[in-house]
Amino acid sequence: MTTATHDPSIETVSDSAWCTSTPRRGTAGGLRSVGTALDVLECFAMDSTLGVSDVARRLGVAKSTAHRVLTTLAGRGFVEQDASGSYRLGLHLYELGMLSHARNGLRHVALPVMQAVADQTGHTVNLGVPDGADVVFVERIESVDGVRILGHTGRRQPAHCTSSGVVIAAFNPGVDRERRHAGFPPKAKGTIRRVEDWDRALTDVRRRGHAALHSGSFTDASSVAVPIRVHGQAVGSISVLGPTPLIEPDMRRVVPLLTAAANRIAKQYSA
């Protein structure tokens, strides 16, 4: 098992749950009022508390509209108002989110396999699934050495900023297409920034079966990922993440473990 001392320069990163580089989903063909309510909820991905004026300004709507939507959402428990009059996400939204999390079949299959990889490597292990142009980490087992990089934030990342996103896009045309449409804005010094580099990375993954990214999302952090493929298409990824000095020298040992884990998850998930 990899051993390491805590690096004070690698701490839990304060990062928004929402990818500002990713276009928000449209509401073409849907109800405008529902779209507005969802836009209001998404405002809270950037800030824990917001006032009526804050929401109105961000969405470009009248304060009266923002107030009506917030009042309706509060009545259903999706937001709640504190003593100062500001709003925050409500417990009912948390309940629904936990139900979605608990009912994720891939997560149920992957969790014991992830734990085995964590025990063998000592690194943080992530399960990523695609969502549009992004990858969302639906499960995480933290490193035993106390080095925390993501903590409870950073659950959603643009696909081009993570090894998980790259390996999924290499075997999932939909993710590849969505990321190309969204572009490749830089996030850290190792972020893929050009379509030519994206093409090269996907070709490399298809040849080698895994991806490694250094300082893709966070400076001096590295990750290695392998796709979880069902009927040839990537439905997720399993990866390890940690400070670059720990991950880089351990890649030769880690990649076969991740490959075996991904194959086991895919076999059980598709059974």
Q: Can you annotate each of these PLM segments?
A:
Residues 2-7, 11, 18, 146-217:
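Short, solvent-exposed recognition segments
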Residues 2-103, 107, 233, 263-271:
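N-terminal helix-turn-helix
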Residues 222-226:
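Short hydrophobic beta-strand micro-motif common in sensory/regulatory domains
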Residues 85-183:
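Amphipathic alpha-helical effector-binding/dimerization core
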Residues 195-203, 208-211, 218-220, 235-271:
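Juxtadomain coupling helices with adjacent low-complexity linkers
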Residues 228-230:
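Sensor-regulatory modules in signal-transduction proteins
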Residues 30-34, 90, 103, 107, ...:
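Short, structured helix-loop boundary elements
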